[in-house]
Amino acid sequence: KNGDLRTPVITIFDARGCKDHANKEYTGPKAGGADDEMCVKVAMQKIAVAEDAAALVLKECLSELKARKK
């Protein structure tokens, strides 16, 4: 019904001071400081929508908006 719904998913990697493993999340050029051990990943991921839950949220939101309008 809603097609291919996608949303941005943000993941933050902070490996400052971590010596347990080699950090391979970032493969670009090094900055030469603490920033070399941090990375932010943004990816669009498919999401599943529970139609019954979505309908309930919509109903509650509309009810709240109508109550505020009075």
Swiss-Prot record:
Heterotetramer of 2 different alpha chains and 2 identical beta chains which form 2 alpha-beta heterodimers within the heterotetramer. The keyword Cytoplasm does not apply. (2R,3E)-phycocyanobilin binds at R16. InterPro entries: Globular_prot_asu/bsu, Phycoerythr-like_a_sf, Phycoerythr_a. The light-harvesting system in Cryptophytes contains phycobiliprotein complexes. Unusually they are composed of either phycoerythrin (CPE) or phycocyanin (CPC) but never allophycocyanin (APC), with only one type of biliprotein being present in any one species. Unlike cyanobacteria or red algae these proteins are not arranged into higher-order phycobilisome complexes, and they are found in the thylakoid lumen. SUPFAM superfamilies: Non-globular alpha+beta subunits of globular proteins. It is found in: Plastid, Chloroplast thylakoid membrane. Mesobiliverdin binds at C18, Y26, K41. GO terms for cellular component: chloroplast thylakoid membrane; phycobilisome. It is a peripheral membrane protein. Contains one phycocyanobilin chromophore, one mesobiliverdin chromophore and one 15,16-dihydrobiliverdin chromophore with binding mediated by both the alpha and beta subunits. It holds the Pfam family Phycoerythr_ab. It comes from Chroomonas sp. Keywords: Bile pigment, Chloroplast, Chromophore, Electron transport, Membrane, Photosynthesis, Plastid, Thylakoid, Transport. This is Phycocyanin-645 alpha-2 chain. Light-harvesting photosynthetic tetrapyrrole chromophore-protein from the phycobiliprotein complex. One of its GO terms (biological process) is photosynthesis. Belongs to the phycoerythrin family.
